[in-house]
Amino acid sequence: FAGTLGLCVLAIAIIAVKQRKTGVPVRLPLLLLGLIIFQAALGMWTVTLNLLPVVVMGHLLGGFSVLSCLFILYLRLRNTAYKLPKNNDTPSASEMHDNAIGDLPQAKVFQRNLRRFAFIGLGVLVTQIALGGWTSANYAALACTEMPVCESGWQERIDIAGAFSVPDADNYEFGAHDYGERVTMHIVHRFGAVVTFLYLLALGICVLVSRHATDKQKYVGAFMLVALCTQVALGLSNIIFMLPLAVAVMHNAVAAVLLLSLLNLIFTVFLSLENDQA
């Protein structure tokens, strides 16, 4: 699968370079190609460095980065296709309304603020994904099996410095950190989940209730909230049911869906501001 993906991205990059004069994005496909090459190296290092946690987490983040770049490329190409004239027809009223933000200064201010807060949300979400990757790479997903925080006495086990360091070991399979450090990783990931949930929940609700948000943004905001609630349910299920494989895989998959929905929201903001300036 990895080889097929690499060949597809290589083909995309070659086509983009050849079609660069037609307005097709070039830098993004080239960035994708570089990410694929780096991903291949991380995959090799995962084996040769005996599951070094930094490499395992980097491999996960690299996969999310490749998926994000592919999605952004899709959005840009779709938007370019929509801009192409079709039999000299003018856009319909519904098409113009979908991305219009109006002439009111408040609408423009809302879009600029939404762009800022959506980027902050992206940073929060990526940080939480990285924390999840670090927790998983160090086999700390089951370090805490009680709610809402951890087993009693967890306060005495907190070791931030140790939890986010890489101990010397010949092999990192099944983890090389002690129990207290794994508890710390798990708890930080839980608190990160709370922060991420509250922030994205507030962001999504603001989009839904604002009269300055476009129809597309409201749709994306609603989808993001559904993905967010699903992700929380999957995270709780991982703890309650002791990390079943299917739930763990879905937890990663929905994290990717949540990331893509947030990227889509950001794209709609740029599209609205761009249409307003045109």
Give the positions of each predicted feature:
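Polytopic transmembrane helical bundles with strong interfacial aromatic enrichment
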Residues: F1-P91, E95-A278
